[in-house]
Amino acid sequence: MELNYYEILEISQTSDKETIKKAYRKMALKYHPDRNQGDKEAEEKFKLVNEAYEVLSNDEKRSIYDRYGKEGLKGQAGGFGGFGDVDLGDIFSSFFGDGFGFGSSTRKKEKGNKYPQDLKITTKISFKEAVFGCKKKIDFSYKSFCKSCKGSGSENGKLDTCPHCGGKGQVGVRQGFMTFVQSCDHCKGSGQIIKDKCKTCHGNGYEEIKDHIELDIPEGIDSGMSLRVQNKANELPNSSQRGDLYIKIIVEDDDKFIRHDDDIYTIVPVFFTQAALGKTIKVSTIRGEADLKLPVGAKDKQKFELTNEGVKNIHNGKLGSHIVQIEIKFPKNLTDEQKNLLLQLEKSFGLADEEAFIEQESLFDKIKSWFSH
């Protein structure tokens, strides 16, 4: 069932103008296309929210709608709801201003700049480079505005008003009895076009320049972290210096070590006699070999912590831990002599077959007793 305008804005039919404005603001923000890119359902709801506000914010149209519904509005000047002369971007801007970052506001802010001033790149480093830090050469390219056309892309340095949108950067598209606003395809939302392209930059407004830096990567950096280098990114016509370069770090995996935050994890094979006797074993850490004293009768998959053998925290300098999980190994093949030795060991513990059976039977009786009450 189709919702009425009051239901779309989630207000009652007796709501005053201030309530309608607040409801519109809330719903427009919620369903704005810039916040829900690629979401067709949100896009349709945003159109309905604007449609509802256009009617309910106008006393005359609201009165007609309350009496006759949508049918009563069809005969109004400018088509249904009078949207023929209304710019939804202007409605939105009247609430949120030109600095809010949505719709036509964004277009005005970016007008004249063909690219952002800051630059983001990604670089890979090895596991050990991340753990201990390193100095690394980073190659990249940045954009520098064309000096011939001052970044405009036009031969004479001037841009012409787009004839399709009249310089607004957006056009109205009619769908049935409604008109909605979308970015102008002809000028890509800029409101301006280039008639004669600059021969130096071929209309791009910039040139790509290769550059490199020697980057000091700090000890303990982790995958996903970014480093900023000032004044090494793109150059804009109206700026005295270049933007900031942001370098996202991707750390490659290691064959032996697994890292989680500042801790290192490894699985260490331990022979069953070492676990039974509580031997001291050697463990390879990121900082060299360390001794690990096993308790007598250590269990398979038991974990042990070697403090201060992990990664240095990039913020406070504290060292993490090295977590060792042991994996008890048994021999696959035994000689006759080894079998006899194990049998002798078994007998030395007094593990006769009859005693083992009695112990199992006793356990079985205990379990049965749980269900007898």
Swiss-Prot record:
Binding site for Zn(2+) 2: 162, 165, 184, 187
Record keywords: Chaperone, Cytoplasm, DNA replication, Metal-binding, Repeat, Stress response, Zinc, Zinc-finger
UniProt feature coiled coil, ranges: none
Organism domain of life: Bacteria
Zinc finger (CR-type): 133-210
UniProt keyword Hydrolase, yes or no: no
CC cofactor note: Binds 2 Zn(2+) ions per monomer.
Subcellular location, record wording: Cytoplasm
Pfam families per record: DnaJ (PF00226), DnaJ_C (PF01556), DnaJ_CXXCXGXG (PF00684)
Cofactor(s) needed: Zn(2+)
One function term, GO molecular function aspect: unfolded protein binding
Function in brief: Participates actively in the response to hyperosmotic and heat shock by preventing the aggregation of stress-denatured proteins and by disaggregating proteins, also in an autonomous, DnaK-independent fashion. Unfolded proteins bind initially to DnaJ; upon interaction with the DnaJ-bound protein, DnaK hydrolyzes its bound ATP, resulting in the formation of a stable complex. GrpE releases ADP from DnaK; ATP binding to DnaK triggers the release of the substrate protein, thus completing the reaction cycle.
Subunit details: Homodimer.
Family: Belongs to the DnaJ family.
Protein name in the entry: Chaperone protein DnaJ
Organism: Campylobacter lari (strain RM2100 / D67 / ATCC BAA-1060)
Organismal lineage: Bacteria, Pseudomonadati, Campylobacterota, Epsilonproteobacteria, Campylobacterales
